[in-house]
Amino acid sequence: MKNINPTQTAAWQALQKHFDEMKDVTIADLFAKDGDRFSKFSVTFDDQMLVDYSKNRITEETLAKLQDLAKECDLAGAIKSMFSGEKINRTENRAVLHVALRNRSNTPILVDGKDVMPEVNAVLEKMKTFSEAIISGEWKGYTGKAITDVVNIGIGGSDLGPYMVTEALRPYKNHLNMHFVSNVDGTHIAEVLKKVNPETTLFLVASKTFTTQETMTNAHSARDWFLKAAGDEKHVAKHFAALSTNAKAVGEFGIDTANMFEFWDWVGGRYSLWSAIGLSIVLSIGFDNFVELLSGAHAMDKHFSTTPAEKNLPVLLALIGIWYNNFFGAETEAILPYDQYMHRFAAYFQQGNMESNGKYVDRNGNVVDYQTGPIIWGEPGTNGQHAFYQLIHQGTKMVPCDFIAPAITHNPLSDHHQKLLSNFFAQTEALAFGKSREVVEQEYRDQGKDPATLDYVVPFKVFEGNRPTNSILLREITPFSLGALIALYEHKIFTQGVILNIFTFDQWGVELGKQLANRILPELKDDKEISSHDSSTNGLINRYKAWRG
């Protein structure tokens, strides 16, 4: 990968001039000038997904200049580098190959001259065999009963992805009850343990090193709880499995290393649901559906790696995001799924984007003088409409939004879905076109009221519009289409990282807090007054000690 400061490129300078021409152009004007705008600014993927980006403050010239930026930053070369197993995560000297985990074509992918696909396939086969034994009831707990509940213990990528996917694909789930524990706050695991029976519960401990503080604290608490009922430590092996590479620590915990599912250092945590970390997904929806999830992602991988940039969905969404983030000064993006099963999707890509591209140092080691990753947030519709859409519609901040919805619902109750989708369509129309003062006044006249007598309230009912959105309409949320959607966002994030000249696949920003917490933890063991920190931290620790009793 080349290290190119995007702001020093000719394309960036051209975009800056173009922005001066575009900053006062409205979405309404763009639609008024071109009746064919939708067909020019939308792409259908695999007859499963329609991405409409027409309600953006862009023209064909805008996209052409953004494509020039991608070319000048050698995006095509970076894509090739990632897919070929080059060690593009240079700060950790690692390849980045989540695409290998879902490489259903099984073509060789080399890391250090070795094809990784045989090992990938071997772990998948092991996951298949194990999951089928659990789901069928062939696997018995220590009292001879079948497993009814699965508790995934992990944090970050070992929790967010599996939890998001198992929730999104609940219509495909089997009889097993899924639970997820991540927070080191004892409340999290305590509440889950109240719901399960030690005789019929399987715990998955997801930690590559088997040393992650939060995960191992929860795992040991689960083990202690289990042994209070089971007594003999030999029974641990029937109720615990590990998603890890540390065979020694796994064995010492009491887990049979035959039930340790490995992954590799070229799998980043926030891209790991496709790996053994996805075992909870397999247990929830079955192996065949998990393969469909992989297949959907693989289809998007092929689209991303082979489609010209002009019709390449991850590239288009990435470039539009850069347009708002780096030229309009938008600081956030909202992800708004109109599907209750997708209620963790925004949270998943909050990590996916902010941990990937929340960097202030470029690939040359220099502090950047431009914006990098945006703040990502969102909630399902229509809940968000009654919470924060007020600011999106009438606030002073530009918030570009992705609206996501399925055409077909898994729960066709009465006219619920039509009402949901009517809101989905209405919101992007309202954000784009708004409501003028003239329309507000005419509405008053139609009600037999004189707008002049209501002049004090009219300004508050005006919507400026010109708020940008993308609409992603899925035929239906299936394992395949969800896999494709996740991969779409993954590759969007990668594309932005390439152009912004940052390392997307490390996360050094999570380390300092952990180091300081490890230093503070021994200081909390006694009641001595602390004076080794700044006055604020000392004061907080000392008040905690006084109040805890």
UniProtKB/Swiss-Prot annotation:
The keyword Nucleus does not apply. It comes from the Bacteria. Its EC number is 5.3.1.9. Pfam families: PGI. It is found in: Cytoplasm. It is an enzyme of class 5 (isomerase). The keyword Transcription does not apply. SUPFAM superfamilies: SIS domain. Pathway: Carbohydrate biosynthesis; gluconeogenesis; Carbohydrate degradation; glycolysis; D-glyceraldehyde 3-phosphate and glycerone phosphate from D-glucose: step 2/4. GO terms for cellular component: cytosol. The active site is at residues 355, 386, 514. InterPro entries: G6P_Isomerase, G6P_Isomerase_C, Phosphoglucose_isomerase_CS, SIS_dom_sf, SIS_PGI_1, SIS_PGI_2. One of its GO terms (biological process) is glycolytic process. Keywords: Acetylation, Cytoplasm, Gluconeogenesis, Glycolysis, Isomerase. One of its GO terms (molecular function) is glucose-6-phosphate isomerase activity. The modification N6-acetyllysine is found at residues 80, 228, 234. It catalyses: alpha-D-glucose 6-phosphate = beta-D-fructose 6-phosphate. HAMAP family: G6P_isomerase. Belongs to the GPI family. Catalyzes the reversible isomerization of glucose-6-phosphate to fructose-6-phosphate. This is Glucose-6-phosphate isomerase. It comes from Escherichia coli (strain SMS-3-5 / SECEC). The gene is pgi.
